[in-house]
């Protein structure tokens, strides 16, 4: 976790306190980004490992969605895929964490989700975010909005996720796996 941001916020709070004002330090959410071989990896909030270490259980206490949107509209040249995982509380949809990786736009999306976590917002709130839009930068439905829609679908029972570790058992029990993606999305 990069400490420059938290250190500067603490310094400001200390200075405010010495000047007669002051607020309590709210701690850190844990937001970071780094460049790895031409890609940006970023995260904010809690990841699954931290939640499980705290005794929380997938499905019961938290769920997640993983989406693969483009960082801007696909008709504009250069649209790059982002892999975005959003973790949320099962009981009320409060956002707990997110991780993303991609060539472009990853830091922007993680920063927006970090702000949502800092305000204890829900996946439904993400759907309503009005984010800047222009074809070179985003889509009318930004990846942040799309993550909110996907998570809300899970909470409302409109979408039932199947984890990779569950797939083999489902296929063995007779389930059929059908890939409905168009050829240009299959890679």
Listing of model-derived features with the role each one plays in the protein:
Residues 1-104, 139, 143-169, 175:
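Mid-to-C-terminal Rossmann-like scaffold of FAD/NAD(P)H-dependent oxidoreductases
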């Amino acid at each position: 976790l990069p400490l420059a941001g938290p250190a500067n916020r603490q310094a400001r709070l200390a200075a405010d306190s010495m000047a007669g004002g002051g607020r309590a330090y709210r701690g850190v959410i844990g937001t970071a980004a780094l460049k790895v071989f031409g890609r940006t990896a970023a995260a904010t909030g809690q990841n699954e490992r931290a939640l499980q270490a705290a005794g929380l259980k997938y499905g019961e206490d938290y769920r997640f969605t993983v989406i693969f949107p483009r960082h801007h509209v696909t008709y504009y040249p250069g649209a790059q895929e982002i892999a975005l995982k959003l973790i949320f509380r099962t009981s009320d949809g409060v956002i707990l964490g997110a991780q993303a990786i991609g060539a472009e736009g990853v830091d922007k999306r993680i920063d927006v989700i970090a702000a949502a976590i800092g305000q204890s917002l829900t996946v439904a709130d993400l759907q309503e975010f009005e984010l800047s839009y222009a074809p070179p930068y985003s889509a009318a439905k930004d990846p942040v909005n799309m993550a909110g829609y996907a998570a809300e679908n899970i909470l409302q029972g409109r979408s039932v996720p199947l984890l990779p570790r569950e797939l083999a058992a489902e296929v063995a029990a007779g389930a059929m796996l059908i890939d409905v993606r168009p050829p240009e999305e299959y890679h």
